[in-house]
Amino acid sequence: MVKIKPFAGIRPPKELAAEVSSRPYDVLNSQEAKAEATERSLLHIIKPEIDFDPIADEHDEKVYKKAVENFKKWRDNKWLVQDGEEHYYIYAQTMNGRTQYGLAMCCYYEDYWSGKIKKHELTRIEKEEDRMKHVELQQANLEPVFFAYPDNDEINKIVADYVKNNKADYDFTAAPEGFGHHFWVIRDKKINDRITEIFAGIPALYVADGHHRTAAAARVGKKRQESNPNHTGNEEYCYFLAVTFPASQLRIIDYNRVVKDLNGMTTEQFLKALEKNFTVEPKGKEIYHPSKLHNFSLYLDGQWYSLTAKPGTYDDNDPIGVLDVTVLSNLVLDQLLDIKDLRTSKRIDFVGGIRGLEELKKRVDSGEMKAAFALYPVSMQQLIDIADTGNIMPPKTTWFEPKLRSGVVIHTFDEK
């Protein structure tokens, strides 16, 4: 059963919420961040390399130092202000007319090590350590991780009633995506206490997005424990910031692939080779979207094709083997195109479905890439099944949208 707690969040005044909050550090590069950052944007804190001209190496010591300076400046200028009491917070997001309702909370670092916070991706040590360094220097979780939890009717009712009966503290539409962000401070102590009690009966949380931030936060907690002879387990550094959503409200969108070449084959040879494991149907020049699991779109030489994996080419009882990313990797990328390692190969790139299949067409038509594959999205249930069985998804399998804004609320464990 998971352990959570409310916290005294650091957050912008209402009139600055849209300007201070920003997209997460890992969805835009330094040049994009520099162009997007206004004077008070959190990007100056989470991507502080943009404050140097020319843009500095993000791992340079002066960059980490600048992040600390900027966080202090934002607080000194009252662009970020700490709440006087501990709360849970409702953070809702609207995309394409659909709203999902999360709870901003502090999660317990030991739940990560004990497996109650379940992951589905591998992490890279160097990325963990970069995030760790920021957390340790700031003594804060500046950016939340994105978790899912098994649906709970009482939590759903608490959130729905609070939203209905209380005006949002923030309510804004964020550029450049145009998604709505809505935020309530839960100021009723009885409700906050009840949320803690209910989550104590929830068996697990699932990392949806933010595996490196989660690992980094858990490592910081463990490191602080080991260096504190008087550690009790109740210290603020034992907790880290997450926004946690009911699993049924989340949607994973497609995460597609583009390849540079056909491994020496002509178009005709490649299409013929595909017929061994797929039913191949030409679809013409109109964009074709995969219609169901095990159905893929192929864009090649100005034409779209439907590829449907034949029965027997995947195992319905294998939570990893049944994934379309695995089917495509095994039967096409590996067998036909000799692309063995998706993490290191320079012959493949990945395109989040938020960009649409038009982006795949553009990458191929420009001559940059030879072919594109669009996949049917993974379901939340597939993600949960994989995490529950201790398996790891292949690289670049899940893309969640909308992303959480960074700086809507921050958790600090600075106990000075």
Question: Where do the PLM segments sit?
Answer:
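Surface-exposed, charge/polar-rich loops and edge strands
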Residues: 1-416
